[in-house]
């Protein structure tokens, strides 16, 4: 009996030794809604009048400068509890106005220190709020960028315009990864428009993986829905349990964060919603009994809860500290909290050729939508200039 016991101990010791010899690299990928990151100048053809010096928010250089400082502080702090001095390799953003605000944001000392760069394509949103990606070139190499439009269905107004899906293709840890950033329509118009969005993102993910089967896809954004809602759980097919995820599904780690732990990223009437999600394709998962570290795999997710992001007093104590509320400038951050996921990969493992990393071409329906949006943009700009 003793001999068997000591033999078992020897096997366990060997396993621990082998395990200890393996070293893993960790990469963080984040998302953060910037809550109206506007500059102080009018963009021709855009309804950005609230965010001008004479607008309802009295948006001036002082407030814009504080906003840039605050958001860059939060972005640079994301994931640094786990990865001190490194933070996120890639961060998706929503509610940014244009290239100028992204240039100014990345020039802030907190982000400039890590050489963050950005990807952005102007979208058709009439207010001028878009999605973007910032990234550290030392960790993520960009290969291709496209903004795939939201195409209205026959049940919707043919001229319904909203933010599309910003796809950024590149190399992370030498592997082909595509990040899709979305900001789905608000809740004011009912759930259907977001369910359409979820289905279109799923179709885009499938097109990407049909072109590049080994590509790993990360969908992120302000979904204006919780993980439990139909747009996410059914239309996007984002499941809460790794063991439930089939080849045509995705994994949503935030489902249980909300349902089991009651945590969220956006407080409404005293209750938390979790709109800010980062969702993963199946090839980023290790299912039960499989521990493959030779390629990038999901490790964990975290809501980023830096203390300075919260109200510490008053009626909304415990909620997010916004830039403005009730017409009052609070010199805060955002009405949303940032989120991050962590991926791991064993060091020293050879990586397969990632291929060209190019994104799929636009469909005919997408091309038509892009052309229509461009004509509408030109008409708005002409009318705007005529008023001046």
Please tell me what each predicted stretch does.
Residues 35, 97, 185, 223-226, ...:
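Catalytic metal-binding/acid-base residues of hydrolase active sites
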Residues 20-21, 205-217, 225-388:
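Metal-dependent phosphoester-hydrolase catalytic domains
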Residues 1-24:
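Bacterial Sec-dependent N-terminal signal peptides
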Residues 28-31, 89-94, 117-120, 131-135, ...:
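Structural recognition of the beta-strand scaffold that forms the well-ordered cores
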Residues 98-100, 126-128, 187, 224-230:
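Active-site environment of divalent metal-dependent phosphoester hydrolases
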Residues 90, 96-176:
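Structured beta-strand-rich core segments of catalytic domains in phosphoester-bond hydrolases
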């Amino acid at each position: 009996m003793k001999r068997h016991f000591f033999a078992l101990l020897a096997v366990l010791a060997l396993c621990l030794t082998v395990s200890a010899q393996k070293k893993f690299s960790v990469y963080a990928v984040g998302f953060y809604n910037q809550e109206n990151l506007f500059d102080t100048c009018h963009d021709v053809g855009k309804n950005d009048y609230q965010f001008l010096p004479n607008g309802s928010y009295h948006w001036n250089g002082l407030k814009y400068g504080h906003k840039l400082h605050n958001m860059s502080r939060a972005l640079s702090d994301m994931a640094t509890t786990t990865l001190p001095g490194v933070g996120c390799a890639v961060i998706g953003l929503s509610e940014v106005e244009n290239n100028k605000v992204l240039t100014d944001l990345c020039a802030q000392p907190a982000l400039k220190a890590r050489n963050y760069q950005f990807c952005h394509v102007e979208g058709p949103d009439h207010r001028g709020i878009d999605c973007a990606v910032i990234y550290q070139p030392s960790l993520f190499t960009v290969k291709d960028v496209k903004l795939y439009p939201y195409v209205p269905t026959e049940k919707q107004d043919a001229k319904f315009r909203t933010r599309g899906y910003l796809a950024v293709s590149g190399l992370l840890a030498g592997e082909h990864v595509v990040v899709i950033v979305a900001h789905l329509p608000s809740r004011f118009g009912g759930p259907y428009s977001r369910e359409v969005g979820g289905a279109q993102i799923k179709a885009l993910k499938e097109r990407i993986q049909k072109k590049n089967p080994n590509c790993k896809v990360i969908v992120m954004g302000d979904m204006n829905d919780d993980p439990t809602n139909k747009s996410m759980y059914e239309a996007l097919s984002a499941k809460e349990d790794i063991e439930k995820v089939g080849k045509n599904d995705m994994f949503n780690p935030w489902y249980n964060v909300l349902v089991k732990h009651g945590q969220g990223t956006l407080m409404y009437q005293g209750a938390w919603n979790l709109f800010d999600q980062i969702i993963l394709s199946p090839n980023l998962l290790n299912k039960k009994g499989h521990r493959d570290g030779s390629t990038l795999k999901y490790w964990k997710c975290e809501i980023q809860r830096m203390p300075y992001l919260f109200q510490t007093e008053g009626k909304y104590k415990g909620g997010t500290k916004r830039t403005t509320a009730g017409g009052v400038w609070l010199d805060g951050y955002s009405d949303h909290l940032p989120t991050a996921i962590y991926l791991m990969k064993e060091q020293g493992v050879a990586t397969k050729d990632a291929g060209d990393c190019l994104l799929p071409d636009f469909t005919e329906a997408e091309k038509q939508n892009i052309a229509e949006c461009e004509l509408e943009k030109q008409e708005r700009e002409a009318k705007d200039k005529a008023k001046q």
